[in-house]
């Protein structure tokens, strides 16, 4: 399946404790259907001390399912994403609400 949400996209969280917050996607995991969004879904993890790293409790982003985030368009509103094939055969992402091309 083609990736509707990609690295670098600005997204808004639709459900959960971070509902309504926006952030930038910095990693997408297509096999799991999840993404990591900067500053969203933060969890605390106990880190064991190593030679390179100090031990203690660290805060990091946990994966969030792609169905729980929506792309934020140029107008600042969440929108669904579709695909359109251009005349030269190139496939581009399109915002469903406005019809504006996202990339390409």
Curated annotation (Swiss-Prot):
GO terms for cellular component: ribonucleoprotein complex; ribosome. The lineage of its organism: Bacteria, Pseudomonadati, Pseudomonadota, Alphaproteobacteria, Hyphomicrobiales. One of its GO terms (molecular function) is structural constituent of ribosome. The keyword rRNA-binding applies. GO terms for biological process: translation. Belongs to the universal ribosomal protein uL24 family. Coiled coil: none annotated. One of two assembly initiator proteins, it binds directly to the 5'-end of the 23S rRNA, where it nucleates assembly of the 50S subunit. One of the proteins that surrounds the polypeptide exit tunnel on the outside of the subunit. PANTHER family: MITOCHONDRIAL RIBOSOMAL PROTEIN L24. It comes from the Bacteria. This is Large ribosomal subunit protein uL24. NCBIfam families: rplX_bact. Part of the 50S ribosomal subunit. InterPro entries: KOW (IPR005824), Rib_uL2_dom2 (IPR014722), Ribosomal_uL24 (IPR003256), Ribosomal_uL24_CS (IPR005825), Ribosomal_uL24_KOW (IPR041988), Translation_prot_SH3-like_sf (IPR008991). Keywords: Ribonucleoprotein, Ribosomal protein, RNA-binding, rRNA-binding. It holds the Pfam family KOW.
């Amino acid at each position: 399946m083609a990736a509707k949400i990609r690295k670098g996209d600005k997204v808004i969280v639709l459900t959960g404790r971070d509902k309504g917050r926006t952030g930038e996607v910095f990693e997408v995991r297509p096999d799991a259907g999840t993404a990591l969004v900067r500053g969203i879904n933060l969890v605390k993890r106990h880190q064991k001390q190593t030679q390179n790293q100090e031990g203690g409790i660290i805060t990091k982003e946990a994966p969030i399912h792609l169905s729980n985030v929506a792309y934020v368009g140029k107008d600042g509103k969440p929108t669904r994403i579709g695909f359109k094939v251009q005349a030269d055969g190139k496939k581009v992402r399109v915002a469903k609400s406005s019809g504006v091309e996202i990339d390409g």
